Amino acid sequence: MLVPIVVEQTGRGERSYDIYSRLLKDRIIFLGGPVDDHVANLVIAQMLFLEAEDPDKDIHLYINSPGGVVTSGMAIYDTMQYIKAPVSTICVGQAASMGALLLSGGEKGKRFSLKHSRIMIHQPLGGFQGQATDIHIHAQEILKLKKRLNEILAENTGQQLAKVEADTERDYFMSGAEAKDYGIIDNIIERNTPSGGTR
């Protein structure tokens, strides 16, 4: 993948950055694509770096993801809850599966979606082959993960656990407005204001 380079004028001349490093200067982390261990490690490292720089200043996590590996996503989620710096989440494009859980895990009042973004929740997917006993062990693990993910989603949204369990039985798609009603996000952003805020 080609990563754009941006050039900035500084007192010492020109300086070039890859686009993600430049965004990081403004405390912006971009999660684009499926969540796996490699992506999770990059996102976590950036969060820890920004936390060390200023633990009181917001971190902005932009999400455009179809989801991915549950344990990788939970590593990001737990780091969001662990650090002191508030993490604002913004859905651009889509936040599906683990992406939706991460979106809901942002600081309350600072979870956003762009106008035409799509949000989708569902139960975790899994596949395993091998001996019958091992298949049974993995099936039990998936059921435990499903229960925990539903509990987290219920806690983050304010929905009853029974409703979340019913809604995640199959793919459950939402618009930004529907995700706001559900409690996954707090507001829909249409454009940045000149002062850097949103409206």
UniProtKB/Swiss-Prot annotation:
Organism superkingdom: Bacteria
NCBIfam families assigned to the protein according to its UniProt record, in alphabetical order: clpP, PRK00277.1, PRK12553.1
Ranges that cross the membrane: none
HAMAP family in alphabetical order: ClpP
Protein name per the record: ATP-dependent Clp protease proteolytic subunit
Family: Belongs to the peptidase S14 family.
Gene3D superfamilies found in the cross-reference section: 2-enoyl-CoA Hydratase, Chain A, domain 1
Enzyme category, top tier: hydrolase
Record keyword Protease present: yes
InterPro entries in UniProt: ClpP, ClpP/crotonase-like_dom_sf, ClpP/TepA, ClpP_Ser_AS
Catalytic activity: Hydrolysis of proteins to small peptides in the presence of ATP and magnesium. alpha-casein is the usual test substrate. In the absence of ATP, only oligopeptides shorter than five residues are hydrolyzed (such as succinyl-Leu-Tyr-|-NHMec, and Leu-Tyr-Leu-|-Tyr-Trp, in which cleavage of the -Tyr-|-Leu- and -Tyr-|-Trp bonds also occurs)
Catalytic residues in the record: S97, H122
GO MF term set: ATP-dependent peptidase activity; ATPase binding; serine-type endopeptidase activity
Pfam family, one: CLP_protease
Record function comment: Cleaves peptides in various proteins in a process that requires ATP hydrolysis. Has a chymotrypsin-like activity. Plays a major role in the degradation of misfolded proteins.
The entry's keywords: Cytoplasm, Hydrolase, Protease, Serine protease
Major location (coarse): cytoplasm
Example GO BP: protein quality control for misfolded or incompletely synthesized proteins
EC number(s) reported in the record: 3.4.21.92
Cellular component terms per the entry's GO annotation: cytoplasm; endopeptidase Clp complex
Location within or outside the cell: Cytoplasm
Subunit comment: Fourteen ClpP subunits assemble into 2 heptameric rings which stack back to back to give a disk-like structure with a central cavity, resembling the structure of eukaryotic proteasomes.
